From Swiss-Prot:
Disruption phenotype: Mice are normal but males shown reduced fertility caused by diminished sperm motility. Addition of cAMP analogs almost completely rescue the motility and infertility phenotypes in vitro. Double knockout of SLC9B1 and SLC9B2 results in male infertility with a severe sperm mobility reduction, indicating that these two gene are functionally redundant. This is Sodium/hydrogen exchanger 9B1. Belongs to the monovalent cation:proton antiporter 1 (CPA1) transporter (TC 2.A.36) family. GO terms for molecular function: antiporter activity. Sperm-specific Na(+)/H(+) exchanger involved in intracellular pH regulation of spermatozoa. Involved in sperm motility and fertility.
Amino acid sequence: MSEHDVESNKKDDGFQSSVTVEMSKDPDSFHEETVEPKPELKEPEPKEPEPKEPERKEPERKEPERKEPERKEPERKVPGRRETQTKETQTTEIERKETKKKRGTNSYCPPQGTINKTITDGAALIALWTLLWALIGQEVLPGGNLFGLVVIFYSAFLGGKILEFIKIPVVPPLPPLIGMLLAGFTIRNVPIIYEFVHIPTTWSSALRNTALTIILVRAGLGLDPQALKHLKGVCLRLSFGPCFLEACSAALFSHFIMNFPWQWGFLLGFVLGAVSPAVVVPNMLMLQENGYGVEKGIPTLLVAASSMDDIVAITGFNTFLSIVFSSGSVISNILSSLRDVLIGVLVGIVMGVFVQYFPSGDQERLTQRRAFLVLSMCISAVLGCQHIGLHGSGGLVTLVLSFMAAKRWAEEKVGIQKIVANTWNVFQPLLFGLVGTEVSVESLESKTIGMCLATLGLALSVRILSTFVLMSFANFRFKEKVFIALSWIPKATVQAVLGPLALETARVMAPHLEGYAKAVMTVAFLAILITAPNGALLIGILGPKILEQSEVTFPLKVELSNFHH
């Protein structure tokens, strides 16, 4: 229907209504007024509106809908931009095709994608290195401290990436930290490379303490009070029991096998007592996504307890570290360690209350400000406590501060966790690379390795057995208890921090105790190398076979799901 016909129809309607009204009033006036519109009625052919009148009555309201496409016709004319855009896209596609034709068979010149990104990053790195060389000088040249740090970082990073690319069918992926550890070990035991890699003790100590701080911050932010209340006794038994029993058994076995003093034995025990969330959490999340063990909450239990287990181990290590390197009596050492714990808790509460209200919620870039404030305050607390001799206080300050802040922020802490996780991604290659550089093949004797393996194996056996027994009081089947016990053996990050920390403290404060510290370092290295890949394989293989599979109707909300340390 054309616009002219529509207008004529409207006029017809108006004319008929006027006719009916005027007839009711005055028929004479009707005859007079009808004379004028008659020529207008004859213009649009009278035969067309008559059959269309019933159509007009029903879809009168639909006519404006039919007019919409008619109204869009001028809009199509106006936005010729779309036509120009389509023409531009066509021309760009034609240009791309022409460029591809010009390239011919040599389609990789200039390169695209990953190769292009790698070349770009390399050029930026060279430019940055040139700038640092102009500012610092010899530090960035081979043999300098910064040069060695960069070599270790990139070697460990590449080692982790290479291990990620190695995929074996039917076998779960291996943790990248093993590749980082082996990269540092390779640098240490290749004389040509290690000749140019020198890192001062103060640098490595500061880096390890910073990595430890990030671990504790992530642990504090990741603690979920609701999950802990829901799991209650089971989570507490799994967090405290195996760690304490493994520490005591390691102290006992190292005392009789390796001739360790009792203080050093307990220090070694708390180094070994921590489980690695870097191995446990990703594998638990994979099982959870497929519905394995979700009905009984096994993934939730292991994820929540892994963080608490690390906290117990680090606190025990700091306590015995202060006991080992102090010259007082046993009673005075115990009192000083309790003093450190009390100071750490009180300072952490005060700083945690401050962080809850500062910065306020009306500030810009609130997430970045909060993350920076928490990290800077925690790192300052750890390094400052180390400097003044309160070895057991810094970690507790960090833990209490981050936990109180997370409790106040609730769901807003997710963005802060992501920032802290990105910070950890930078320090992780440095940490494991530095651990690898501390282990020299020349200094290792077969007898020493045998004693370390014996102590490690016996302590792990006690841990597995104690975990199984402690889970007997929960509502788990026999196979599920076996799975939980075997899932509780991987060790990685905490051992990478605490093992070298004891060695560096011995070098600075008591060089005559360096032999014990090297033995602790060796046991920590072997624990990472043996338990991390084997633990990942056991979890990935036994999980689908042992745990019951159920339909996942909703995602499991666990705050520690981003915990990758």
